[in-house]
């Protein structure tokens, strides 16, 4: 077994990369499964970028079928696949080490990245099926995943290129709904508003930019910008926007909140 980056953190060696030795799983939400995926993803990105020299050496073509595992605690490991059949959770691509010396290093890393992306999706939706996610939960999970750059995009540099292309067209408040919306709620604090309806379209450039800004606004919980006619609320601490229904805040309740903190910011303060 080849270790890497503090490997066994999420589930123990090649035994499924995060399974837990056959112990039953507690029910999880889409957000919890997403956090699991995000940790595994961070570990695999680390293996293919900052720890790439160590990863390259561990993938010796002379050894048996090796796999790259990512763990929920943002560590990674190169090791043999699980011995149990069927495995506790889906397995990553086998034999990533065999192609190492027959390809350009960048191409090989990109290939491993593609297979890693595929594995993350399979693990996430395995959990979705195991925990009985309904259509709405599966949609939330997919949208949250889709808002992250893929491992392939990070490893090949495509993620940075996309970010640079977006920057010139986005304002400093591109993550918030348009100022038209805020003007509708001037009697409220900046954190409380309803999502915009297409009003009085003036057709000028400024209006188009504001519309683009709102189109780019994503709910911090479900990761979508669906429900443009629904109530939204902004966290005064992290300035992320949320569907009211996702954080269980109604317009009536929002009227009495002087400073709103989202669940993530509230939990951080509690832990501190």
Swiss-Prot record:
The record ties this protein, via Gene3D superfamilies, to: Zinc/RING finger domain, C3HC4 (zinc finger)
Q: Where is this region: Disordered?
A: 1-24, 162-218
Name a Pfam family for this protein.
Answer: Alfin
The annotated regions of Acidic residues compositional bias extend over: 201-214
Annotated GO CC locations: nucleus
Q: Where is the composition biased (Gly residues)?
A: 1-23
Q: Where is the composition biased (Basic and acidic residues)?
A: 183-200
GO biological process, any: regulation of DNA-templated transcription
- GO MF terms, alphabetically ordered: histone binding; transcription cis-regulatory region binding; transcription coregulator activity; zinc ion binding
Q: Where are the zinc fingers (PHD-type)?
A: 216-268
Q: Which InterPro entries match?
A: Alfin (IPR045104), Alfin_N (IPR021998), PHD_AL_plant (IPR044104), Zinc_finger_PHD-type_CS (IPR019786), Znf_FYVE_PHD (IPR011011), Znf_PHD (IPR001965), Znf_PHD-finger (IPR019787), Znf_RING/FYVE/PHD (IPR013083)
In this chain, the site described as Histone H3K4me3 binding is at: 232, 236, 241
Q: Where in the cell is it found?
A: Nucleus
This protein's UniProt keywords: Chromatin regulator, Metal-binding, Nucleus, Transcription, Transcription regulation, Zinc, Zinc-finger
Ranges of Low complexity composition bias in the record:
168-182
Family the entry assigns: Belongs to the Alfin family.
Q: What does this protein do?
A: Histone-binding component that specifically recognizes H3 tails trimethylated on 'Lys-4' (H3K4me3), which mark transcription start sites of virtually all active genes.
Q: Which PANTHER family match?
A: CPG BINDING PROTEIN, PHD FINGER PROTEIN ALFIN-LIKE 6
- UniProt-recorded name of the protein: PHD finger protein ALFIN-LIKE 6
């Amino acid at each position: 077994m080849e270790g890497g980056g503090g490997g066994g953190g999420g589930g123990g060696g090649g035994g499924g990369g995060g399974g837990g030795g056959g112990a039953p799983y507690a029910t999880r939400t889409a957000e919890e499964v997403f956090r699991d995926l995000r940790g595994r993803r961070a570990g695999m990105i680390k293996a293919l970028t900052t720890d790439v020299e160590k990863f390259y050496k561990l993938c010796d073509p002379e050894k048996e079928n090796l796999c790259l595992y990512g763990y929920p605690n943002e560590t990674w490991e190169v090791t043999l696949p699980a011995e149990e059949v069927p495995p506790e959770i889906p397995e990553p691509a086998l034999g990533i080490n065999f192609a190492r010396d027959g390809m350009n290093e960048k191409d090989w890393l990109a290939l491993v990245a593609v297979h890693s992306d595929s594995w993350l999706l399979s693990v996430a939706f395995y959990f979705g099926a195991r925990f009985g996610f309904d259509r709405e939960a599966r949609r939330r999970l997919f949208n949250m995943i889709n808002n992250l750059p893929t491992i392939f995009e990070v490893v090949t540099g495509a993620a940075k290129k996309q970010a640079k292309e977006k920057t010139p067209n986005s304002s400093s408040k591109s993550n918030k709904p348009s100022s038209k919306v805020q003007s509708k709620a001037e009697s409220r604090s900046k954190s409380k508003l309803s999502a915009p309806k297409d009003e009085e379209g003036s057709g000028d450039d400024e209006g188009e930019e504001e519309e683009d800004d709102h189109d780019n606004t994503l709910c911090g919980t479900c990761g979508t910008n669906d429900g443009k006619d629904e109530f939204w609320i902004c966290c005064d601490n992290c300035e992320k926007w949320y569907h009211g229904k996702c954080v269980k805040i109604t317009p009536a309740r929002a009227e009495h909140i002087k400073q709103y903190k989202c669940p993530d910011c509230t939990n951080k303060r509690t832990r501190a």
